[in-house]
Amino acid sequence: MVNIELKGGVVKEFDNGITAMEVAKSLGMGLYKAACACRIDGEVKDLRTPIDKDCKLEILTFDDDDGKRALRHTASHVLAQAVKRLYPEAKLAIGPAIDNGFYYDFDIDVPFTPEVLEKIEAEMKKIVKEALPLERYELDPEEAIELMEKKGETYKVELIKEHAGKGEKISFFRQGEFDELCAGPHVPDTSRVKAFKLTSCTGAYWRGDSDNKMLQRIYGTAFTKKEDLDNYLTMLEEAKKRDHRKLGKELGLFTIMDEGPGFPFFLPNGMVLRNTLIDYWREVHKRYGYVEISTPMMLNRSLWERSGHWDHYKENMYTTVIDDTDFAIKPMNCPGGMLVYKLQPHSYRDLPLRMGELGLVHRHELSGALHGLFRVRCFTQDDAHIFMTWDQMKAEIKGVVRLFDEVYSVFGLTYQIEVSTMPEDHMGDEKDWDFATETLKAAVTEMGKDFVINEGDGAFYGPKLDFHLSDSLGRTWQCGTIQLDMQLPERFELEYTGADGEKHRPVMIHRVVLGSIERFIGVITEHFAGAFPLWLAPEQVRILPISDKFHDYAQDVCKQLDMEGLRVSVDTRSEKIGYKIREAQLHKIPYMLIIGEKEVESGTVSVRKRGEGDIGAVRIGEFVDSAKLDIAEKNIW
């Protein structure tokens, strides 16, 4: 018999060798039908896993992230099986679950047109109706290679050969006639994939490397309820309209050219947006007691060896040789910040020391992974490093969370907090880890905030808080991080003199609030659908004279608004006023000021507000005061 601890701490006795699926069935048919996977002693497993020792068991449904991944991973197998049934010559590459869905890469000459995708979907529905059980089995590497070679799956053979020689068995899942190289977990049978949709097809290089063959990637999503699928597809259509790559082009914000894949060009409107965002960042950080530094973009190899990046991150770094010495363009700002701290001695009276840096970093990403501003090869990280004593830790964490609250609320973004704890591969004393982790939890709890635990997902040098932002479409974006670090101060031998006159090692917080300026611009562009709040809009006011004879008055109004600090332009083209209004609406200008005979005679302007339309004639000074108050309060509308 085995003792299994269930949800709520209840311990029940079961027969040795019982599967998680059988446990779920014993607890109720509702749970059994909803089960997608399980977690045994914190490790995600297949529901068919036999339990032969005392353990803690969690049954995972689609409401759990790992449950979603299991169901969507199974959906990717159903997709691959359908393609192989219809096109036996297709070669399979990889097909993981991803955020909000799944994909599968195929090497096939047949183009996956919308008509072909419909045909594949129909075959998938047949496979779902067949309720094929997913059965896990293992082979020695040699047997696995033989099986895949026999099936002509050259990409699978390549993957297996990478694991051969490690002394590990190779796991497969079988559903009907289909065998797939996979570690799992999966739902019990294909009938659980109740609601799914193939959403698009794109090209993707094998392993994301442009030197490799271009494959066809089919994207899809899957849910347990049709209603949830329909809601998601509606959101997806709205997201397409808000795509920051599309809006970036239409609004003149940024572009990415063939001459620099992954290296964004910011255009005039984009620079106004970017600089306004950075000005706000600086204003907030000054109020919260931060000083700002700037460290070189390129530093020599010895620094990166000392920080550990040369050994653990070199494949993502751009390197060069200067005067026979290896240099690297910085992928992170931290090591430079350590050197600044070490420039002068510090006393406990100097701490906490909060140092911010808007540092341009470069990281090599595979070409297949690049995506607008969301995944680039160079970006500005809004870093800060806080050097403190152990007893200042909780107060500093709270201070950072308060700063995050202020910044995110300005953009109308809510968040969820995730606490990532000590991984198996970690450095440092476990007592220090326990203290740091409990301090993180206590700080957010005392502030009345909820959090979830992400067991074992901390960095090797310390636990962290991750802030997952929710946008206007309900999508989540991981932007803010508060990362405790007990190791980098040790590597760089950072010190301060304590009240006892002795040398002590400070503790450090790495933190970012926006994460990457470029990525955050992408996020808020989609969040606001390009209709930025007045304070953030690249062009705040557009003056529209009805005809040429009102141009002089329009230019006078423009000068007055410009002197008051508003970002304003005049549309002097000889076009009908309706055309000018429609174009300003397409450009998502917050305010249009219409000028005709009546406005010139009365010294007023007729105001059209984005989203509201005509709000009437007002005096220029009155409009300026209202707009400046709106900007100062950073209102969202």
Question: Residue locations for each model-derived region?
Answer:
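NTP/phosphate- and nucleic-acid-binding module
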Residues: M1-H73, V78-A93, I98-W637
